Amino acid sequence: MRLLSFVTSIFLCSTFYGKQSESCFASQKNVPNLISFAAGDYNVFHTASKENTGMVQLEVKGPPVFDRKYFKVRAFGAGLVNFQGSLWIGGGINFDIWFGRPFVMTLGIGPGYFSKGKGKDLGYPMEVRSSVEFAYQTPKLSRVGLQFYHLSNASFSSKNPGVECLLLFYAIPL
């Protein structure tokens, strides 16, 4: 698996950077704050449901508070709204895990305020977002990728249906 990742990194670096340069594999020393714009599917696993709808999201990722070569911890703040008026606003922590320079996987978790609008009732005004995203980082430090997450009230209420979201995002440095 490591060999496949290395070969893929060499191919992408030579394709997008024009040559196999050392900078392509350099550590992520200067990780910028990011603002991310995303759109996708709300309640993605229940496409026949009336509660399945589109959504948009805005997210800001702060500077790393724990910084190692291939692992970074940073705070995030985000807001989402779906096309039925449901709203989630919250924040938490993200864990950036680097696989060569251009590829990063981010795991995240954080609580937030939820309002159902005319959408699915998730059972409680506090919902926790647990997420995973896979992204390609361009030479200018912007990112493009997919994000998947689950919103759940973590059983603070007896009603805890949760919802899954799948988004395509584009993040730019601040």
Region roles according to the model:
Residues 60-64, 95-97, 136-138, 150, ...:
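Residue-level signature of outer-membrane beta-barrel architecture
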Residues 20-63:
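Outer-membrane beta-barrel initiation region
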Residues 44-54, 69, 79-90, 99-101, ...:
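Solvent-exposed loop/turn segments connecting transmembrane beta-strands
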